[in-house]
Amino acid sequence: MFYNTLIKIYSKSDPNSYIKSIYADVQPYLKSIMFEDGFEINITRRVFCDIENSISIHSYMEIENEKYKVMDIKKWDSYMEVYLYKLKRQV
């Protein structure tokens, strides 16, 4: 893994909720999540990074001036995988 992409972490989609920046390995990813009412969203990015306590399923991230919502997190021994949904409305 190459931690060569700068990621800004936010507690909300609001730019004033900035927490910190980290470097991570960001990869394209495609998975759909279907909800009961037929609503579907696509997970389009997967982030690999060191375990970071400031990242939760309530977090938002900014990568290359685009905002994402954290949808899922898988923690391993020494790193974590974070699955992201690209926001349609860039706040």
List each model region and its residues.
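N-terminal disorder-to-order initiation segments that are Gly/Lys/Arg-biased
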Residues: 1-48, 72-91
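Short, surface-exposed secondary-structure edge patches
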Residues: 50-55
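Short, isolated positions in well-ordered beta-strands
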Residues: 68-70
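Structural motif
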Residues: 63-65
